[in-house]
Amino acid sequence: MSSKVEYKPIQPHEEAENHFLQHELHKVKARKYYRCALVVAIIITLVFCILASQLLLFPFLSITSQTTETVLNKDIRCDDQCRFVLVESIPEGLVYDANSTINPSIFQSWMNIITNAKSSIDIASFYWSLTNEDTQTKEPSAHQGELILQELLNLKQRGVSLRVAVNPPDSPIRSKDISALKDRGADVRVVDMPKLTDGILHTKFWVVDNEHFYIGSANMDWRSLTQVKELGATIYNCSCLAQDLKKIFEAYWILGLPNATLPSPWPANYSTPYNKDTPMQVMLNSTASQVYLSSSPPPLSATGRTDDLQSIMNIIDDAKKFVYISVMDYSPTEEFSHPRRYWPEIDNHLRKAVYERNVNVRLLISCWKNSRPSMFTFLRSLAALHSNTSHYNIEVKIFVVPATEAQKKIPYARVNHNKYMVTDRVAYIGTSNWSGDYFINTAGSALVVNQTQSAGTSDTIQMQLQTVFERDWNSNYSLTFNTLSSWKEKCIF
């Protein structure tokens, strides 16, 4: 028997319910769709707002990044034919043997670049005391400093602009030269390094016409020309290097604005492609040279700039035969910190060079009435490494500038103020004393020159600086440290 299949027609109320369910299902799907669309729209809006905010708040962010990359990828070759002149101030009464090398004077170098300036002079300085009035003396030897000041005062009428970045003066007397310059049209900015880094602006350099420059140990002080032993370098016709040094000046200049703060990072226009890893390839005195400028402290160094301490340690580590150092102060401490802090960075690298590589290390350190007694304790520690049994090649001498009774009365004079180092590979001319404070929070700078590729040349800059060091080391003013029963016997007038 076949079964019957009955088909029940859908009742009207069932059909309505089915339509209702389908309608509700479409509504649920629609709500989900609209919710998803709303979420996507909100996300897109937020992203757009963030991007718009960045463009409004940091309009140069992407440009700065691209510019920095462009600066750092710049060709490190320079086509300038630069002329390098090693310059010195030899204090009156300090006389070398007849055959000794005497370099051109810092005074004559400054006069040359002032009188030949065509458009601009920028000077980064610690303080100004170019006249007898500044030091409350009546010294005929102040004449050179007074001439320098007069030439600088006359720049405006020659159409030459003068900018001066200077540390805050510590007394009204130290403000007189600056006030006179401002009255004659110079632009002066006081860089409040004590507030910015808890240090000082200790650097000493000039940039002239973006083409020539001086860098070295001499302050803007008449005593630095006739009563203090100084060393520096003047480089002529070298726009590549001059403009790179000017970037360091511009950093000081911007920090001299009211309520200035340290930028982090520095904008791209302060960056440099020239450093210890990629030095500038340039001709100095017709000799192929690798050159860069270092700076301290680290917060003042823009992208690409080698920090001054890193430069010094790298030069020591790079030496193969010898490291000769001539500085006023040497101490593995932070001299001005409270509480006291030990700071062995440079000291460790010197000991390592002696012990591991048998490098010959010589330190020629200044000795005068303002020397810190603690410095000699640390120097004795270095000198103790040298003995007939150890065969470690490290020697320490102190340099004493002689003084007459009249010269003893000149304040803060009669001292070897040099701040340089020379190795078998590199010449380093700086502006800082060698203790921790000068590299941690004090502004300084240095010129680093390597002419090793031209080892056959008889007059490389390394050789010139080595000659100066050996002249001083072998002079009657240099005393073997181990033979001194008391540093006070020789240093205190």
Swiss-Prot record:
UniProt domain PLD phosphodiesterase: residue ranges: 197-224, 412-438
**Cytoplasmic face: residue ranges?**
1-37
- Provide the membrane topology annotation: Single-pass type II membrane protein
Positions of transmembrane segments: 38-58
Q: Is the Plastid keyword given for this protein? A: no
Mind telling me which InterPro entries this protein's record contains? Diverse_PLD-related, PLDc_3, PLipase_D/transphosphatidylase
User: Would you name any one GO CC term?
Assistant: late endosome membrane
User: Cross-referenced SUPFAM superfamilies, in alphabetical order?
Assistant: Phospholipase D/nuclease (SSF56024)
Q: What's one GO MF term for it?
A: single-stranded DNA 5'-3' DNA exonuclease activity
What superkingdom does the record give? Eukaryota
Which modifications occur after translation, per UniProt? N-glycosylated. Proteolytically processed to a soluble form that is stable within endosomes and lysosomes. During transport through the secretory pathway becomes proteolysed by cysteine proteases, thereby releasing a stable soluble lysosomal lumenal polypeptide, whereas the transmembrane-bound fragment is rapidly degraded. Its transport route to lysosomes involves ubiquitination and the ESCRT complex.
GO BP, sorted A to Z: immune system process; inflammatory response; myotube differentiation; regulation of cytokine production involved in inflammatory response
> Which reaction(s) does its UniProt entry say it catalyses?
Exonucleolytic cleavage in the 5'- to 3'-direction to yield nucleoside 3'-phosphates
| Keywords from the named record | Endoplasmic reticulum, Endosome, Exonuclease, Glycoprotein, Golgi apparatus, Hydrolase, Immunity, Inflammatory response, Lysosome, Membrane, Nuclease, Repeat, Signal-anchor, Transmembrane, Transmembrane helix, Ubl conjugation
Q: What PROSITE patterns has UniProt attached to this entry?
A: PLD
Write out the topological domains of type Lumenal. Answer: 59-493
* Broad class of the protein's primary localization: endoplasmic reticulum
EC nos = 3.1.16.1
What is stated as this protein's family in its record? Belongs to the phospholipase D family.
Query: Which PANTHER family does the record associate with it?
Result: 5'-3' EXONUCLEASE PLD3, PHOSPHOLIPASE D - RELATED
This chain belongs to the protein called 5'-3' exonuclease PLD3
Lineage of this protein's species? Eukaryota, Metazoa, Chordata, Craniata, Vertebrata
